[in-house]
Amino acid sequence: MSCPHHYPSLTAIICCYTKTHMSKTIWLRVALPETDLSALRKEFPRCEITTETDDAIGPAQLERIDGVFTEEALPDSLVEQMPNLRWLHVTRGGVSAYLTPEVKARSIQVTGSKGIHGAVFSEFALACILALVKKLPECLQAQEQRKWQKLVPVEIEGKTLGIIGLGTAGSELGRKAKALGMRVIATKRTATPKPDYVDELGTSDFLPHLLAESDFVVLLLASVPSTFNIIGENELRMMKRSAYLINLTGGRAIEEPLLIRALKEGWIAGAALDAFARQPLPEDSELWSLPNVIITPRIAGIPSQKWPAMLPIFRENLRRFTAGEPLRNLVDKELGY
């Protein structure tokens, strides 16, 4: 079996021949730079690489596909045309959006790029915290009005940071916050030994204590059913009135109307939001107009140089897939992570 040659575009098909000469067909549904595609050709000499777009791939090609590397979720209408699909690798660490009914129902292994977004998420969280306490939104508003307004910034040293979800990103944030002199407390899904940079660590039972103690609460959760509405009215009222909520990953962790009410009525001081139940956030959402809210368009986890971080995981999993070995970052499709 061979693949026709084309120049790289938005998608690519890789026909991989294993040592037993059994072919594997991998669809690269991502916009890889030419240099990276060339490197893949050299690393996998038995693979013929050709590029196709979604519209250009015909039924005969789809039937041969064994694996897909994608940035956007695969619609079930495409998955249904790939009877041999056995592996789906995605560019994100969180994979819930990719677990469509067809993907979940079939014997398709799903792997993600978990572990590479910690630095960018942690930096973004700190940027939000510092912007809020240093009154940058108020300064920008005053600048637009050409108004010389005296404000009183607050120091973060000695303040308590509560991290809900001490995974890769939460751990990176904890390390950085501790280096800045903050007290760090956190929750984790399962009980593990406490790392040195965390002052207190617990599981879900620890959440009320974390909310009551924290000056900043950062949500770094997988968007899965077990985390939906994890922050309700009782939890918001446990927080200090001077506390800030930063939500970077759990768009459905808190209901939007409830959060709006909490912000308008002063249950908490403010929020920075990069994750929403409705994305993009609709223009008619009241969140846009609240003065104590920073809204960003789902950019917290985007690295400026993503391929150097993502490709090593894909290349290793491609090697494992063609060799019949266990895949790295394999997702439990029932749990969603």
Question: Could you describe each region identified by the protein language model?
Answer:
Residues 3, 15-16:
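Cysteine-centered motifs
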Residues 17, 21-111, 232:
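An N-terminal-biased, well-structured beta-alpha scaffold segment characteristic
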Residues 72, 92, 219-221, 248-249, ...:
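Glycine-rich, N-terminal phosphate-binding loop of Rossmann-like dinucleotide-binding domains
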Residues 179-197:
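NAD(P)-binding Rossmann-fold cofactor-contacting core
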Residues 191-286:
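Rossmann-like adenosine-cofactor binding region
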